[in-house]
């Protein structure tokens, strides 16, 4: 049997004291218990939850059995429950690719390993490997509108309340808010997102579409923006699926392969007031190709490695060093700053986690046991 949580032990002793016949009024119970939980691996899931399971309401019964689900207190874990509309759930091959993006991440752990273990829960739909008992199909709705309200309603009806502190919730849907956006994460960071590359807007989603969009939206939950630490999109030195240039087609590697994860390098910044074409992305661009915007609004992509000179202003040469160019196409002149995403993930968005932050637990007044007075009144 697992050790009982401390709060349960306190309530039990109070109840025993009451039943022992004390006529003194019980001391008022403080209404909030704040616990700074130990989180050795920094994934926002306290060691106690990852070791013993999570008891959401302090009744001594584990509600989310984290160790049985594969959690490790010394390695970063992410849990994602996936609900889905008919035909929209990603394939097993796509889910395998998502897992691989995280398992191969350049993130170190206290147990000496690298990578993040992502636990995807599709219920029974994709076999035991992706079944943690939570994911399920929901009614088809080709337009979640308004998206936040309708997503929250589906979450409330299809996601166990006790999971809120552990699992991110996502939905494989069709479209939302009358538009054709590929997805939505509602907040940065957050605990909820939707992937909406469905039939209504003729996405004809492939595994690539689903993998790129899932990883992108989850990235918002993990604190990442379209420019890394800022919202500037299409920065050629930001080699991440968080960049719209690479969400659906992958980050382009110079060896011809594609990468479907978050950036693991931070190439040199580019000053659009006087970008140095001869420098390309600098030495950290060697393993990549990249894309940027020309003055005519069209996207151009390097044919070779991005540490080579790049024609940022699209005038046919790669020798300009003092000519302004709007390289990310946003009609402003900025310094384009990249980010190493993996070094900047925020765990514990929304309601997820206890982590190193003091966490307000359920008020003890809501866990109130039967009082002696009430017990006597029953007879
Ligand atoms: Ca942890
Ligand atoms: Ca962990
Ligand atoms: Ca040029
Ligand atoms: Ca610009
Ligand atoms: Zn986005």
Question: What are the roles of these predicted feature ranges?
Answer:
Residues 1-28:
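Secretory targeting and sorting signals
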Residues 40-48, 58-64, 316-320, 331-333:
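Glycine-aliphatic tripeptides that mark coil-to-beta-strand junctions in extracellular
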Residues 45, 53-71, 108-112:
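Short mixed-charge
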Residues 29-39, 72, 76, 81-239, ...:
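Active-site-proximal segment of zinc-dependent metalloprotease catalytic domains
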Residues 262:
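Acidic (Asp/Glu-rich) catalytic motifs at the cytosolic membrane interface
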Residues 50-51, 247:
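Disulfide-stabilized cysteine-rich extracellular repeat microdomains
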């Amino acid at each position: 049997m697992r050790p009982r949580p401390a709060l349960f032990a306190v309530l039990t002793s109070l109840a025993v004291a009451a039943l022992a016949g004390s006529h003194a009024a019980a001391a008022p119970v403080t209404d909030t218990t704040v616990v700074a939980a130990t989180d050795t691996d920094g994934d926002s899931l306290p060691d106690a939850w990852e070791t013993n399971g999570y008891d959401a309401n302090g009744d001594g019964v584990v509600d989310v059995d984290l160790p049985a689900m594969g959690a490790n207190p010394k390695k970063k874990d992410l849990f994602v429950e996936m609900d889905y509309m008919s035909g929209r759930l990603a394939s097993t091959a796509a889910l395998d690719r998502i897992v691989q993006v995280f398992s191969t991440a350049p993130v170190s752990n206290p147990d000496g390993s690298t990578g993040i273990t992502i636990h995807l829960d599709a219920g029974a739909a994709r076999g035991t490997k992706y079944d943690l008992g939570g994911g399920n199909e929901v009614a088809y709705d080709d337009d979640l509108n308004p998206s936040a309200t309708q997503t929250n309603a589906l979450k409330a009806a299809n996601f166990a309340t006790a999971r809120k502190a552990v699992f991110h919730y996502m939905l494989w849907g069709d479209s939302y808010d009358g538009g054709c956006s590929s997805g939505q994460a509602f907040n940065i960071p957050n605990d909820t997102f939707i992937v909406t590359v469905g039939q209504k807007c003729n996405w004809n989603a492939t595994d690539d579409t689903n993998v790129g969009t899932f990883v992108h939206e989850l990235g918002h939950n993990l604190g990442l923006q379209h420019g890394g630490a800022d919202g500037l999109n299409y920065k050629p030195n930001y080699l991440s699926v968080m960049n719209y240039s690479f969400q659906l087609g992958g980050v382009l590697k110079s060896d011809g392969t594609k990468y479907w994860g978050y950036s693991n390098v931070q190439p040199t910044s580019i000053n659009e007031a006087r970008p140095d074409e001869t420098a390309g992305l600098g030495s950290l661009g060697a393993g990549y190709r990249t894309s940027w915007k020309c003055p005519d609004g069209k996207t151009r992509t390097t044919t070779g490695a991005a540490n080579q000179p790049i024609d940022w202003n699209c005038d046919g040469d790669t020798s300009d060093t003092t000519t302004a160019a709007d390289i990310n196409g946003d009609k402003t002149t900025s310094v384009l700053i990249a980010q190493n995403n993996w070094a900047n993930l925020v765990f514990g968005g929304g309601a997820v986690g206890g982590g190193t932050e003091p966490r307000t637990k359920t008020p003890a007044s809501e866990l109130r046991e039967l009082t002696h007075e009430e017990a006597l009144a029953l007879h």
